Regions:
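Acidic, contiguous N-terminal accessory segments
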Residues: 1-117, 121-145
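Beta-sheet entry/capping signal
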Residues: 70, 108, 153, 181-184
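Aromatic-lined carbohydrate-binding surfaces of glycoside hydrolases
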Residues: 155-198
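N-terminal small/glycine-rich loop or linker at the start of catalytic domains
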Residues: 140-159
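Short, intrinsically disordered low-complexity segments
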Residues: 43-45, 151, 167
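A broad, structure-centric signal for solvent-exposed, well-ordered loop/edge residues
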Residues: 18, 80, 150, 161-163
Length: 198
């Protein structure tokens, strides 16, 4: 049997709960995107870039396309098609920080987030799953995830030579893949970090 039938995805940070189902969903032929109105441009573009990185072509629409693999994105509580298509998730999931649920089943992918940023984090999980797959075929699965901490990021606090803008951009891309959400610029030769420190 094909490897992807028993693949267990390694996503980091490790999602809170992963439940595998039977069968697979392929992103090989027609793929249709149905995105809720509450999603910002960054979240919409995240989905498109994840698909483009895996050579998956797509169309966008307001509703499902028969015979296509439909990908639904939506914000919890907004009556989205994504939420209608989601597998049952743990009670109280969306009360947690940056919570999202991702369901792959019946030739569709649904990601519902507490808000548009949480949908972005769900898409990052999808990105990791596809990166581990030799072909764009994914096991049917439900992922429930949320953050333990609201503020997650890194500090650029240096003595001497600062990072280049290219270094910063690369670290932000890497941080995005780790679902970080903050960057602090705090050079140690800033007067408020030494002589004027209070």
């Amino acid at each position: 049997s094909a490897d992807y039938l028993k693949k267990e995805y390694k996503v980091f940070p490790t999602p809170q709960k992963v439940t595998y189902g039977e069968g697979v969903t392929a992103l090989r032929k027609q793929v249709n995107l149905v995105m809720g109105d509450q999603l910002d441009i960054y979240t919409r573009n995240r989905l498109k870039s994840v698909l483009q990185d895996n050579q998956v072509s797509y169309t966008t629409g307001k509703s499902a396309v028969a015979g296509a693999t439909n990908i639904y994105l939506g914000v919890h509580g907004q009556g989205s098609q994504a939420e209608q298509n989601l597998s049952k998730v743990s009670a109280g999931l969306f009360d947690k920080i940056d919570a999202y649920a991702l369901t792959i089943k019946d030739n569709s992918i649904s990601i519902v987030g507490k808000d548009t940023d949480a949908v972005f984090y769900g898409l990052t999980t999808l990105k990791h799953m596809l990166k581990e797959s030799q072909v764009p075929v994914l096991r049917n699965v439900t992922v429930e995830d949320y953050a333990e901490l609201k503020n997650r990021g890194f500090i650029e606090g240096y003595y001497g030579n600062p990072w280049s803008n290219a270094d910063r951009a690369e670290l932000m891309r890497y941080g995005g893949d780790l679902k970080l959400n903050q960057y602090f610029f705090a050079p140690k030769d800033d007067p408020y970090h030494n002589k004027k420190w209070r």
